[in-house]
Amino acid sequence: MKLAVDTHTHTYASGHAYSTLIENARAAKQNGLTLFCTTDHAESMPGAPHYWFFSNQRILPRFLEGVGVIRGVEANILNTQGEIDLHSSVDHNLDWVIGSFHEPVFHPADKAAHTQALIETIKGGRVDALGHLGNPHFDFDFEQVIACAKTHNVAIEINNSTLKGHSRVGSIDRCYEIARVAKSLDAYITTGSDAHFCLDIGGLSLASQLIDEVGINPQRVITHTARQFLDFLELRGRQPIEEFAGLL
């Protein structure tokens, strides 16, 4: 499947990534993206920036190197109450919020705790997508969580970096099963490179392959076209982004 949007990318501001926003934008252009989301780690991750960094994204131009820039964050799920490490004052300056588990912030517990944390995060209404769910350290009830995500219009991320098999080892088969459950429940799917270096921006081939193999309806893949992604943001309650009105 052709994918026009990369919804999960990092700059050096994350503390363990190595490129600037301009470098990422250039790579996005070279790889044929229409939009990309800049989603550095929120402040609870070691080395991550202060929340002002995210609030101040309002100064970013809407286009860099001819590619549309979506202002975002990869927030950390903090607890079973579904709290995330992002000041609520930042919300109105962002377009896109991923909620993810990371071991340094949320110590792996048990399936019930992970399931509760994900469901409460979804119900909290502040995250637009759940990131890299395949991690076996954070097992959860696939059916229960994805059904909740479907009800609340929260997208399920297919993470290309995970599918390479080098990080979150043991995730690949789980990613395929998560995708199959998402297909059966007609949930929304998003795709992210999780790039920590600019050469990986737009690297979505493994995610695209998974989508094709599982047979997910392109209309449920919000990154299939820029317009589908922007329509999803509006479905989530975001205001239309005037500068992107002409994107297809």
Curated annotation (Swiss-Prot):
It holds the Pfam family PHP. Zn(2+) 1 binds at H8, H10, E74, D194. Its EC number is 3.1.3.-. GO terms for biological process: bacterial-type flagellum-dependent swarming motility. Zn(2+) 3 binds at E74, H102, H132. Zn(2+) 2 binds at H16, H41, H196. Disulfide bonds: none annotated. Its cofactor is Zn(2+). InterPro entries: Phosphatase_YcdX_put, PHP_dom, PHP_phosphatase, Pol/His_phosphatase_N, Pol/histidinol_Pase-like. SUPFAM superfamilies: PHP domain-like (SSF89550). Binds 3 Zn(2+) ions per subunit. It comes from the Bacteria. GO terms for cellular component: cytosol. It is an enzyme of class 3 (hydrolase). Keywords: Hydrolase, Metal-binding, Zinc. One of its GO terms (molecular function) is zinc ion binding. Belongs to the PHP family. This is Probable phosphatase VCM66_A0854. The lineage of its organism: Bacteria, Pseudomonadati, Pseudomonadota, Gammaproteobacteria, Vibrionales.
